[in-house]
Amino acid sequence: MIFKPELIKGIAKTSHPYGCRKEVLNQIEYCKNAKQFHGPKKVLIIGASSGFGLATRISLAFGGAKADTIGVSFETGITDRRTGTAGWYNNIFFKEFAEKEGLIAKNFIGDAFSDEVKENVIKYIKNEFGKIDLLIYSLASPRRKDPKTGNIYDSTLKTTSGEFQGPTIDMETDELVTTKVNSATDKEIEATKKVMGGEDWSEWCKLLLENDCLSDKAITISYSYIGASRTYKIYREGTIGEAKRHLENTAIQIDKEWQKKINGKAFVSVNKAIVTKASAYIPSFSLYAAVLYKVMKEKNLHENCIMQMQRMFADKIYAENLLEFDDSGRLRMDDWELREDVQSEVNELWEKITPDNFKILSDYDGYKKEFMQLNGFEIDGVNYSEDIDIEALKRLEP
């Protein structure tokens, strides 16, 4: 079978298995050649199969720390209807490369919100893996079933203060279109907080603590985004922003508990605007990111996921100098994005953009290429005309 890209309304319907393998390898090579750091040896990553979660896992294994890792993710292999998600193949090939280096790379495929997955992970930590030095919570999910009540919650991408209308790039047609987003109801806001807020992160932290699965001075980190004022209405002041504030407030509570019990630390890292499977859905975000990419590349400041995570660990978290937080206790990895000169140029370009010139005034080609690479396409060194043996793929297990 020949694997070809298929995009429908900004959602990738296909992935290329060996393109995913090459992209994982490219990220590994970047980390091996970047500034190294001494860090944790035992790491648990909730949401480990793509985006910041995958980059975190690769950086910790290959960027100096040589960490053994457990990855939890919800992915699917080959079925009658699908050829396997990119995350499925990322898990498989990360494990292959990590084990070649003598590292443990355990994958749990399932619903991270569920009691069953939590119990299985804790059992593995206690019986085989050893205590966790670092817990990363990087889950991006559209839905959550609360195991305590059985209630199902769906997250929404809406404002909380009236209708939003703004330009968005349609990657299927390569056109700039106008998107309208309605204001969320109170019920939708609360549901989004249930899915994308800090409740499940807190539950993982509590269970790991209760089951003596954490080393002394263990750290836990989750990821957030604030962005520029241009994105506030749909993001920071929208349903996602409400959920992220809940996440950030949860970090404060976890931090108090971990400091008291294990002399540990909990905080949120506010990251840069980057192409991920999750961010591609956000109205207007694609255009903002494409313009930002152009400006930051011209200033030699651009970072993709793996570059940002390697800098975070090497220059911030595991550097010799004291770790600095903002007034709300957050690590700011969006420091380069929010530089005054960067935002000034982004705003200047934004005011000039039309449906006819947006590809010239932004780095749309670079933005879309990064999106395609998330799914294993447009990667140098991959033979996309190769007829791939489906039966051989089916035998690969994460």
Curated annotation (Swiss-Prot):
GO terms for biological process: fatty acid biosynthetic process. It comes from the Bacteria. GO terms for molecular function: enoyl-[acyl-carrier-protein] reductase (NADH) activity; NAD binding; trans-2-enoyl-CoA reductase (NADH) activity. Coiled coil: none annotated. Monomer. Pathway: Lipid metabolism; fatty acid biosynthesis. The active site is at 235 (proton donor). InterPro entries: Eno_Rdtase_FAD-bd_dom, Enoyl-CoA_Rdtase_cat_dom, FabV-like_NADH_b, NAD(P)-bd_dom_sf, Trans-2-enoyl-CoA_reductase. Keywords: Fatty acid biosynthesis, Fatty acid metabolism, Lipid biosynthesis, Lipid metabolism, NAD, Oxidoreductase. NAD(+) binds at residues 47-52, 74-75, 111-112, 139-140, 244, 274-276. This is Trans-2-enoyl-CoA reductase [NADH]. It catalyses: a 2,3-saturated acyl-CoA + NAD(+) = a (2E)-enoyl-CoA + NADH + H(+). Substrate binds at residue 225. Involved in the fatty acid synthesis (FAS II). Catalyzes the reduction of a carbon-carbon double bond in an enoyl moiety that is covalently linked to a coenzyme A (CoA). Its EC number is 1.3.1.44. Belongs to the TER reductase family. The record marks 75 as: Plays an important role in discriminating NADH against NADPH. The keyword Oxidoreductase applies. The keyword Lipid biosynthesis applies. It is an enzyme of class 1 (oxidoreductase).
